[in-house]
Each structure stands twice: as structure tokens, then as C-alpha cells.
């Protein structure tokens, strides 16, 4: 992903 999955 680009950002964190959380």
C-alpha cells in the first residue's frame, strides 16, 4: 500500500 494499513 502507499499509507500504513492501520
From Swiss-Prot:
Organism of this sequence: Nautilus macromphalus (Bellybutton nautilus)
Top-level division of the source organism's lineage: Eukaryota
Protein name, UniProt field: Uncharacterized protein SMPP5
Tissue expression remark: Nacreous layer of shell.
Amino acid at each position: 500500500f502507499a499509507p500504513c494499513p492501520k
